[in-house]
Amino acid sequence: MTNWQLKLADKTTKIQVQTGSSQQLLTAWPQLEGRKILILTDSQVAPLYLQRLVQQLAAVSQVFTQIVAAGESSKKLANVEICYQQLIENHFTRQDYLLCLGGGMVGDLGALVASTFMRGLHLIQLPTTIVAQSDSSIGGKTAIDYHDVKNLIGTFYPAEAVLVDPELLLTLPQRELAAGLAEVIKSLLISEQQPEDQQLLAQITPDELTKTALLARLVTRGLQIKSQLAQVDFYDFKERRYLNFGHTIGHAVEALAAGQLHHGEAVSIGMVTMMRALVAHQQLPTSVLTQTQQLLSSLNLPIEIPQQFTHQQIMTKLMTDKKANDVGIQLVLLHDIGQPYLQTMTFTDFKQWLGW
């Protein structure tokens, strides 16, 4: 078991990584006893874990559930309103809890609801995907998509506890597990290397991904990197933006794919696209690109922009990116592994820099 506390602004988040902890929630967070709890989950996760969770908590708490359709399209204002209605009808107060059981979509949606209902409910994250377990469940960002713009409406609201059970990852399809690992690989690329990081990267193979011990180490390392960056830059003005490496192109490709690509697959494409341009401009060692491409390809992750998307379509999508401004767009670039930096380019300069 690994435990630590993350202090962000005026809030403290307890982070716990422990195999099997999802079956011992009251041990991990006894404050749930005697409170009303709304469990928010999606249609994919609910059949796997919802009943087990309700049975644990119903003996000592009033438990309510809200299931939304699986997928990014559920991260919308209509579902925020549905959750509000549940909370109002069941007379929730600020002393009660919203528990997010799911991946990044559920975590983002639920955290936004918790942050805005009565100006703040207690929030617990129980992430079930590798992206959520290693990254999105901590740091306090909440969001929904609006008018086809990703994460346009949101707040900063750290959870009181993030309870990570790597065992939950074993039910993920291989494709989804690999896509999630793209985010862990990204974190290892932008972080100052620790002695164990190269060993971790070497162990990321399809055959090893069924082992909870390795999954626990990977999500723990991802959370440690995210914790360090969020602590020095909670409101996302500088260092925390390093976590967006690969996301500029990635978000555009993901939006154009309209659900045909997982988020991590789009990030994989985005990272390689940026690294190829950096190598072409002699701003990144070729060996870093080669190692990254080989690792991503070994997991069957895409590294090429789908042929049906034109460069102009991608550039048009970039104009609605949150990192865009009147000058252009802020990019996350790499000098080398563990040496990220920010640079703003005009859209014209960026297109030329990419060789498009």
Which sequence ranges carry the predicted segments?
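Active-site segments that bind and position negatively charged phosphate/pyrophosphate groups
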Residues: 206-309
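A glycine/threonine-rich phosphate-anchoring loop and its flanking beta-alpha core
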Residues: 9, 112-204
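Catalytic-loop motifs flanking and including active-site residues across diverse enzymes
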Residues: 79, 177, 267-270
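Short glycine/serine/threonine-rich phosphate/pyrophosphate-binding segments
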Residues: 105-112, 133, 252
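Glycine-rich beta-strand-to-loop/alpha-helix junction loops that act as flexible
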Residues: 70-71, 101-103, 245-246
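ATP/NTP phosphate-donor binding region
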Residues: 1-96
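C-terminal charged capping/lid subdomain of soluble metabolic enzymes
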Residues: 2-4, 290-356
